[in-house]
Amino acid sequence: MKYLLPTAATGLLLLAAQPAVAANTGGYATTDGGETSGAVKKTARSLQEIVDIIEAAKVDSKGKKVKGGAYPLIITYNGNEDSLIKAAEKNICGQWSKDARGVQIKEFTKGITILGTNGSSANFGVWIVNSSDVVVRNMRFGYMPGGAQDGDAIRVDNSPNVWIDHNEIFAKNFECKGTPDNDTTFESAVDIKKGSTNVTVSYNYIHGIKKVGLSGASNTDTGRNLTYHHNIYRDVNSRLPLQRGGLVHAYNNLYDGITGSGFNVRQKGIALIESNWFENALNPVTARNDSSNFGTWELRNNNVTKPADFSKYNITWGRPSTPHVNADDWKNTGKFPSISYKYSPVSAQCVKDKLANYAGVSKNLAVLTAANCK
């Protein structure tokens, strides 16, 4: 396998771009990801090296296991798995039955950041379980294997205070025969569930994904606060997210090419959908596949402001036979509560015009501000 090693300048630029305390995530997360005094910095070229570094951080200098981790970690990943990604792209329907590959961050609360270098890539996921204060940035995840084993790109289970920022996650928005719903392709891009809360998902480029992400694993897993901002979603089918209860604040995202449904607000969840750009989208805001506990939404300052805009932006609606509510009148159905963090959204037009310069990998963690919209 060929590894692409970063230059010293590239590594320094990425580290300089990450603030000493990354508490302002633009959302509910306030994590510093271990970027504190006493943090240990390591470099890894492979999935196994990341795993080994994390396991070593769970014991002290005497070899005694320390609950929550012995010290904060900052792991720079510079491996390259483009060959695995390209092979998977040629055998899309064969990925489902393969073994899932992933780094599991389990029961680690001391603080950890995984930071990809420019040019790195991964055919494995990052699975955060019973942990907190975790940051994943500048990672390029492609064509995850092991859909039958829940092989998500990023999974957050029972883990508060997580920041998923400036990553690229991609596969093929495609259906393979093999199950009753022909769903044997890939698992989710970002699933947040099992009591996880105070999570920010920002500046990611997510494309070619059939099931983008869950907010909640079941109808009883409903209590969470999530923020999605400055993400680009292209050629995706559904779950943007599939929201089971809780609060979702989504602002300054670009949705282009939704082939199934977008926001699916269920189980009395509340969504604030603010200053986003929608185009070429089927059912961009809806509540469906639920019994009767439909969620509500507040629509604020998006490019679509009224039904007359639907044809302009190619917004269309489907009406399933089961109970549902569509935002096909583009009116608010609820009121979002006060927001606990500071944020400064740009206009939806600026999102359309400029966000591609900032979202995804190899952008040196740059952010879009009003000054960039001029």
From Swiss-Prot:
Keyword Secreted found: yes
Enzyme class: lyase
Stored InterPro entries: Pec_lyase, Pectin_lyas_fold, Pectin_lyase_fold/virulence, PEL
Main location class: secreted
Any one annotated GO CC term: extracellular region
Domain of life: Bacteria
SMART domains: Amb_all (SM00656)
Protein name, entry field: Pectate lyase 2
Keywords annotated in UniProt: Calcium, Disulfide bond, Lyase, Metal-binding, Secreted, Signal
Cofactor note: Binds 1 Ca(2+) ion per subunit.
GO molecular function, one term: pectate lyase activity
Biological role: Involved in maceration and soft-rotting of plant tissue.
Localization, UniProt: Secreted
Cofactor (UniProt): Ca(2+)
Active site: 239
EC number(s) given by UniProt: 4.2.2.2
Family: Belongs to the polysaccharide lyase 1 family. PLADES subfamily.
Residues given in the record as Ca(2+) binding sites: 150, 152, 187, 191
Signal sequence coordinates: 1-22
Record GO biological process: pectin catabolic process
Pathway: Glycan metabolism; pectin degradation; 2-dehydro-3-deoxy-D-gluconate from pectin: step 2/5
Disulfide bonding pattern of the chain: 93-176, 350-373
Catalyses which reaction(s): Eliminative cleavage of (1->4)-alpha-D-galacturonan to give oligosaccharides with 4-deoxy-alpha-D-galact-4-enuronosyl groups at their non-reducing ends
Keyword DNA-binding: no
